[in-house]
């Protein structure tokens, strides 16, 4: 089943990843589950995956979740013409409690392209903006507040744990020295410049920007992303009907390791694929975000079998 996967809304221009693979997984559901027709999109974003699912499977109804008000607005517009088949709820998936069991749960993790591309959100080191990085702009500490409040050792540990950054101690020391001497950074570009200065000169112009891992670490910490994922991995199997499928798309090794371990050890689930599904060469060429995407699938066991 092939679908054109480019989705455009008033604010979001987003190409969802691994669309065909997700559609194929839904198509393989038992017919009685497709007839029941309930699906949870735990990270609806701009509504890209959900729009194509609703288009491809007219019997399905989707409940979409997101904590980003901009994403909620974009998804609402994107899915408006599907009427009552799409329900969108402002919620972090870690806090959600469904009213009934469903046939399919999809989670597309991490930060979306529109969030990165909007400088004022503060996720990007390539576009200068305020140091924010909150998925929900109305809740929690901003990045500049986290940097100010966190002691040097704890900051280094955070950058190492969530960014797997080998220069974490050097970076944390530089950040705290800068804050002490000059006050808060003026924006994301200033922080990225400081981080790059902690790298040996020969490593500053490689394929991966020196600030990549530190920005990832700060974003994960600010939004409690791994804790939320742990909650989802624990709760989502209970949302599924027997034979229903849990699909998770991750974008870095920290997420993927958690998903892999959960799918392997959770007695409620049976892995559909032993190895993660990745984008083909054509998708990687047309959608750079897909290059690091990994899709894992697991099926809810029937407790009576």
From Swiss-Prot:
GO cellular component: cytoplasm
Subcellular localization, as worded in the UniProt entry: Cytoplasm
MF terms in GO: rRNA (cytosine-N4-)-methyltransferase activity
Reactions performed catalytically: cytidine(1402) in 16S rRNA + S-adenosyl-L-methionine = N(4)-methylcytidine(1402) in 16S rRNA + S-adenosyl-L-homocysteine + H(+)
Alphabetically ordered keywords of this record: Cytoplasm, Methyltransferase, rRNA processing, S-adenosyl-L-methionine, Transferase
Biased composition (Basic residues): 291-305
EC number: 2.1.1.199
Keyword Cell cycle: no
Keyword Nucleotidyltransferase: no
Binding sites annotated in the UniProt record for S-adenosyl-L-methionine: 47-49, 66, 93, 108, 115
Superkingdom of the source species: Bacteria
GO biological process: rRNA base methylation
Leader sequence segment: none
Enzyme class: transferase
Renumbered residue ranges of the record's region Disordered: 279-305
UniProt-listed InterPro entries: RsmH, SAM-dep_MeTrfase_MraW_recog, SAM-dependent_MTases_sf
Entry-linked NCBIfam families: 16S rRNA (cytosine(1402)-N(4))-methyltransferase RsmH
Family: Belongs to the methyltransferase superfamily. RsmH family.
Function: Specifically methylates the N4 position of cytidine in position 1402 (C1402) of 16S rRNA.
HAMAP family: 16SrRNA_methyltr_H
Protein name: Ribosomal RNA small subunit methyltransferase H
Organism of origin: Prochlorococcus marinus (strain SARG / CCMP1375 / SS120)
Gene: rsmH
């Amino acid at each position: 089943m092939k679908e054109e996967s480019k989705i455009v809304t008033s604010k979001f221009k987003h190409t969802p990843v691994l669309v065909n693979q997700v559609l194929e997984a839904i198509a393989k559901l038992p017919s009685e589950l497709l007839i029941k027709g309930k699906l949870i999109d735990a990270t609806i974003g701009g509504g890209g995956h959900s729009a194509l699912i609703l288009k491809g499977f007219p019997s399905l109804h989707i409940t979409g979740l997101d904590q980003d008000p901009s994403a909620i607005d974009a998804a609402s517009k994107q899915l408006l013409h599907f009427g009552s088949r799409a329900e969108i709820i402002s919620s972090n998936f870690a806090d959600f409690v469904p009213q009934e069991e469903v046939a399919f749960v999809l989670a597309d993790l991490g930060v979306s392209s529109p969030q990165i591309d909007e400088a004022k959100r503060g996720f990007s080191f390539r576009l200068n903006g305020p140091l924010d990085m909150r998925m929900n702009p109305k809740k929690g500490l901003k990045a500049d507040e986290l940097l100010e409040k966190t002691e040097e050792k704890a900051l280094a540990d955070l950058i190492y744990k969530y960014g797997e950054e080998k220069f974490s101690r050097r970076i944390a020391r530089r950040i705290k020295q800068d804050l002490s001497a000059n006050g808060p950074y003026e924006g994301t570009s200033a922080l990225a410049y400081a981080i790059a200065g902690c790298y040996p000169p020969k490593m500053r112009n490689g394929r991966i920007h020196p600030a990549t891992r530190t920005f990832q670490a700060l974003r994960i910490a600010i939004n409690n992303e791994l804790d939320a994922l742990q909650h989802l991995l624990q709760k989502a199997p209970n949302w599924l009907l027997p034979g229903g499928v849990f699909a998770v798309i991750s974008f870095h090794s920290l997420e993927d390791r958690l998903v892999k371990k959960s799918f392997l050890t959770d007695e409620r689930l049976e892995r559909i694929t032993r190895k993660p599904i990745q984008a083909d060469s054509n998708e990687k060429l047309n959608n750079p975000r897909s290059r690091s995407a990994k899709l894992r699938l697991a099926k809810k066991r029937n407790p009576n079998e």
